[in-house]
Amino acid sequence: MEIIIFDTQQQLDAYAAELIVNTVNKKPNAVLGLATGSTPIGIYDKMIELYNQKKVSFRSVTTYNLDEYVGLQPQNDQSYAYYMNKHLFSHVDIPEDQTHLPNGMADDIDAECIRYDTMLEAQPVDIQLLGLGHNGHIGFNEPDVNLSGGTHAVKLKDETREANARFFDSMQEVPTSAVTMGVGSILKADTIVLAVRGADKAEIVKEALTGPITTSVPASLLQTHARVIVLLDREAGRMLE
């Protein structure tokens, strides 16, 4: 595991974007695993900047997102499909049919999970971008006695819904469940990039990276992966220094 601490968020964003863009430039048909939330926005902005500077093309790339809320239409401005179009896809040359998210509106969610895993098996992820939840979740893999290996539906814990409530008009509007890639699916990526910022994440960063490997801190399972690059701003990394 490689851990890099940056003085500024801008430096972190630029470094993460370069990692992803370099992967694409070395392998134009790379498979990218993408994340949502507040942390990746600056990374996607930098990727768009590099695209506009003609330093990368995404036209042969395939993407798989970690998760999607159950019950939100893709056109809903709080869906992750909407987020990805707003923050990345609509600004670069990636064809729409090469971008994939779990379908949170599927009539049969179990069948949708199988479909998504089948696609991931056929197109293994070259580089997976992750954020980190306050309780150690990655994707929507919440702390639990048993963590599902593959894509699955999950009931969201209250603390996760509260953390995401800032994006909605009220707590009542925050979905109670989601479809997420499992930890097993995430760990199949060739390279994993974990990007974390903010003093409020410092404690869970230390626990996930240096504490025991346990399903009560899902991100701690990243310690078992051969190639994880952890990118932290100074505040998130303060308990490691």
Locations of regions flagged by a protein language model:
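N-terminal glycine-/serine-/threonine-rich phosphate-binding loop
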Residues: 1-32
